[in-house]
């Protein structure tokens, strides 16, 4: 067992040594990468941003500040004018859209409810209260009388089946049955 423990310790020591070497290599690579990025940043700034040239006297610096303030004021005025134009045009667009909807009649209509109305009430609503129109649709129909057929008469004669059963139940009912047969 002692031999195996020594081997395990040697393996773990070797692993730790390899990890530390790998971390050192990675750290140097990161430093090189940061240095390269900083150099790229300096090159980009040198190409795209001209160096600042400061005039020597205080009067020249004040003059430069006045010029810059004048440019800022001009830019602000243009910005304000553009905002006003945009607001006007958007308001005109809204008004034109509203007129377009008015002309088309595309208002949101409320849902209609179903109302039961007789023909007389409908005509009264359409024509007004001055005109009196009676639309009794049943008046024009033919009247048909129902003729009794033989089957219907027989059914009426039989009557309610409960009555027949009650009459035939008991001794008197059976007596009547025998008397009627003979």
UniProtKB/Swiss-Prot annotation:
One of its GO terms (molecular function) is actin binding. SUPFAM superfamilies: Troponin coil-coiled subunits. The modification Phosphothreonine is found at residue 12. GO terms for biological process: cardiac muscle contraction; skeletal muscle contraction. Keywords: Acetylation, Actin-binding, Muscle protein, Phosphoprotein. The modification Phosphoserine is found at residue 118. Disulfide bonds: none annotated. Residues 97-117 are annotated as: Involved in binding TNC and actin. The modification N-acetylglycine is found at residue 2. GO terms for cellular component: troponin complex. Residues 2-48 are annotated as: Involved in binding TNC. InterPro entries: Troponin, Troponin_I, Troponin_sf. Belongs to the troponin I family. Troponin I is the inhibitory subunit of troponin, the thin filament regulatory complex which confers calcium-sensitivity to striated muscle actomyosin ATPase activity. Binds to actin and tropomyosin. This is Troponin I, fast skeletal muscle. It comes from Oryctolagus cuniculus (Rabbit). The gene is TNNI2.
């Amino acid at each position: 067992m002692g031999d195996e423990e020594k081997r395990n310790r040697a393996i773990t020591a070797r692993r730790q040594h390899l990890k530390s070497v790998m971390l050192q290599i990675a750290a140097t690579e990161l430093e090189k990468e940061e240095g390269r990025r900083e150099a790229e940043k300096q090159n980009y700034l040198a190409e795209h941003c001209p160096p600042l040239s400061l005039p020597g006297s205080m009067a020249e610096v004040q003059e430069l500040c006045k010029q810059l303030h004048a440019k800022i004021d001009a830019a602000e005025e243009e910005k304000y004018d553009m905002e006003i134009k945009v607001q006007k045009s958007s308001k005109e667009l809204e008004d034109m859209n509203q007129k377009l909807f008015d002309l088309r009649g595309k208002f949101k209509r409320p849902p209609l409810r179903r109302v039961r109305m007789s023909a007389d009430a409908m005509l009264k609503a359409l024509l007004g209260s001055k005109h009196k129109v009676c639309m009794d649709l049943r008046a024009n129909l033919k009247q048909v009388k129902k003729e009794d057929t033989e089957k219907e008469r027989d059914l009426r004669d039989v009557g309610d089946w409960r009555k027949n059963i009650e009459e035939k139940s008991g001794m008197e009912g059976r007596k009547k049955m025998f008397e009627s047969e003979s």
